């Protein structure tokens, strides 16, 4: 199916629609982290999500349960789901929101492996997609191997790594990112560097971590900084069934006009409104706004996004971030995000803006995500 032919009137196939509502029970697994750090607590505040899922499953008239899990409890929680299935006879469907790297105490890949081991139906990333996108390094390698346009990059595996010639290879400026990180953690305006001294100083700071949070796992990625417009889109479905993937029309993230070009990106301080090292926008304006993308460019972004998704063997759903070089007009994939945050609230995640532009409700999108999980499981059974 051509990407331009969006499933604007998407309805679930017989997989989900054919199962009576009273025979289904949805278990929403959410990562929980015990910490006294308010900044990190803010990042893991799911009160908005609970409200949205409450409404969604009321709309669908399906029983559900919100189940926080930690690295210490996920085995028991999943085992209990299996036991409950045997007692009630209801079909458990796991809406898995766990997105942690497990280095810093938040559950992630182990939950996926456990769900697979128990042969449960679960949404989102499988083990391969989770692993290849947890670190930017294997993800970038996959882009390069598939010929997917991405910014030039190099790995800095340790604080003692020799970085001579890196500006000759990547150009200037360079942006430094933790290889393993989510929600822009470890990324700030000082990460954009234009000379060797600034680069060495920032690398040293990054290897020291953030508030006890280790950001050095798998090192640091030094990347050509693409100055220009930024876009983001969403895909539901799995790369093994590209004809069933829904590639949403993208939105442009338009940063505040007062910002210089080398600050027009999602820094942790400004994204989460912490303002420890960076300043808010003048007159309390928004850091950025979302707007629709012109049709021809939108199609090009959708095509590139699907190619990137396929290159990493994407499953379930994803958010794809893209930049366009202001001088050449060339599009570059920044990253493909497995287990991205799901919300219709634009203040929480760009998914909300994407849903708005595509005239899609949160309930409809969640239905697509669940439908994909059922299709994948049905394929395994066949």
Can you name each region flagged by the protein language model?
Residues 2-12, 242, 286, 291-382:
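ATP-dependent carboxylate activation and anion-phosphoryl transfer catalytic cores
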Residues 64, 121-122, 150, 174:
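Hydrophobic beta-strand scaffold residues
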């Amino acid at each position: 199916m051509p990407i331009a032919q969006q499933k604007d009137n998407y309805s679930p196939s017989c997989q989900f629609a054919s199962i009576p509502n009273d025979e289904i029970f949805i278990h929403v697994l959410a990562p929980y982290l015990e910490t006294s750090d308010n900044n990190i607590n803010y990042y893991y505040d799911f009160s908005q999500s609970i409200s949205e899922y409450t409404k969604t499953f009321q709309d669908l008239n399906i029983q559900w349960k919100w189940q926080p899990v930690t690295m210490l409890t996920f085995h028991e929680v999943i085992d209990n789901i299996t036991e409950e299935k045997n007692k009630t006879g209801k079909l458990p469907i796991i809406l898995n929101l766990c997105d942690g790297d497990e280095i810093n105490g938040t559950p992630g890949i182990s939950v996926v492996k456990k769900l697979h081991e128990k042969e449960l139906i679960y949404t989102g990333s499988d083990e391969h997609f989770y692993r290849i996108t947890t670190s930017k390094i294997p993800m970038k390698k996959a882009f390069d191997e598939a010929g997917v346009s991405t910014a030039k990059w190099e790995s800095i595996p340790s604080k003692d790594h020799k970085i001579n010639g890196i500006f000759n290879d990547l150009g200037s400026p360079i942006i430094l990112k933790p290889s393993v990180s989510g929600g822009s953690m470890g990324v700030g305006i000082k990460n954009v560097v234009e000379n060797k001294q600034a680069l060495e100083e920032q690398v040293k700071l990054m290897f020291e971590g953030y508030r006890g949070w280790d950001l050095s796992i798998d090192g640091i990625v030094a990347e050509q900084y693409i100055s220009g417009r930024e876009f983001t889109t969403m895909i539901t479905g799995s790369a093994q069934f590209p004809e069933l993937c829904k590639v949403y029309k993208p939105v442009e993230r338009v940063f505040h006009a007062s910002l210089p070009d080398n600050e027009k990106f999602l820094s942790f301080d400004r994204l989460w409104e912490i303002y420890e090292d960076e300043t808010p926008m003048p007159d309390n304006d928004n850091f950025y706004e979302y707007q629709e993308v012109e049709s021809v460019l939108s199609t090009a972004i959708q095509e590139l996004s699907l190619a990137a998704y396929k290159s990493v063997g994407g499953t379930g759903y994803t958010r794809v971030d893209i930049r366009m070089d202001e001088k050449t007009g060339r599009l570059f994939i920044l990253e493909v995000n497995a287990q991205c945050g799901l919300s219709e609230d634009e203040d929480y995640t760009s998914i909300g803006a994407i849903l708005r532009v595509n005239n899609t409700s949160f309930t409809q999108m969640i239905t697509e995500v669940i439908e994909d999980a059922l299709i994948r499981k049905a394929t395994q059974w066949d």
